[in-house]
């Protein structure tokens, strides 16, 4: 159990990218504020800044509106899926520098209640020359007040929380119980197509144990872009990948929980 102001912490959260259909990855202040206000109206109380720090205005709004933030380091670890040793000598110093930047930038932000070492870290036990454990230790050595999250690393990696992406309801239920590590779903219920239909079952499992810290749905708003097409009078949404003509990208349009 994690306690804040005498009350158990329970994330009813969402992952959030900096994205806008018109402005792309430049997000104006009014979009930030609309995001936070809409989250509050949806009974969302937490944001995982996937997968990097945001503009300082987001943290100001999180403080203002009373939102919890999982402060995530700008570290994408898909490259280590197979423990690629040639990558390690280049990746580790760069990633440790980003870890330091994340900490120094966010350490005084009231809304940041948990550190996250980055994204997709469960594919390997500890790739890139002990990178994961060193990132975890960096935060723990400098901040004893906030728990540290690192997906899939668990107690052996030195984290304060157990965590998975997209576990089954049964797996979540198995994680609940007295004496077990605090557990959080850093991503679940991918809101794509005909999805998000079993939130009740997930939350029945989450609420069944005092060690459960809640969950962050993937994800907040669609990452598509509004573009015009020849001979068509309206704008159409595509992903910001290489080309909307790639069939595998079609399914990423309108991949979100919010239609604001």
Regions from the PLM with identified roles:
Residues 36-42, 46-253, 257:
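Substrate-binding/catalytic cleft of secreted carbohydrate-active enzymes
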């Amino acid at each position: 159990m994690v306690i804040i102001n005498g009350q158990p912490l329970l994330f009813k959260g969402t992952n959030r990218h900096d994205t806008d259909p018109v402005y792309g990855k430049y997000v104006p202040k009014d979009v930030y504020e609309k995001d936070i206000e809409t989250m509050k109206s949806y009974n969302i109380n937490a944001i995982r800044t996937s997968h990097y720090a945001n503009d300082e205005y987001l943290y100001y709004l999180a403080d203002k509106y009373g939102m919890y933030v999982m402060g995530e380091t700008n570290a994408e670890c898909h490259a280590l899926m197979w423990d690629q040793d040639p990558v390690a000598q280049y990746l580790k110093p760069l990633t440790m520098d980003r870890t330091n930047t994340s900490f120094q930038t966010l350490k005084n932000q009231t809304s940041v209640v948990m550190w996250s070492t980055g994204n997709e870290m469960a594919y390997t036990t500890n790739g890139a020359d002990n990178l994961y454990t060193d990132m975890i230790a960096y935060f723990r050595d400098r901040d004893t007040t906030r728990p540290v999250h690192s997906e899939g690393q668990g107690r052996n990696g030195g984290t304060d929380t157990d965590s998975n992406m997209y576990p089954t309801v049964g797996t979540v239920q198995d994680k609940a119980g007295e004496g077990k590590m605090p557990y959080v779903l850093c991503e679940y219920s991918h809101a794509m197509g005909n999805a998000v239909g079993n939130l009740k079952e997930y939350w029945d499992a989450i609420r069944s144990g005092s060690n459960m810290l809640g969950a962050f749905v993937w994800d907040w708003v669609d990452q598509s872009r509004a573009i015009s097409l020849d001979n068509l009078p309206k704008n159409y949404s595509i992903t910001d990948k290489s080309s909307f003509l790639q069939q595998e990208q079609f399914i990423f349009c309108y991949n979100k929980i919010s239609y604001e």
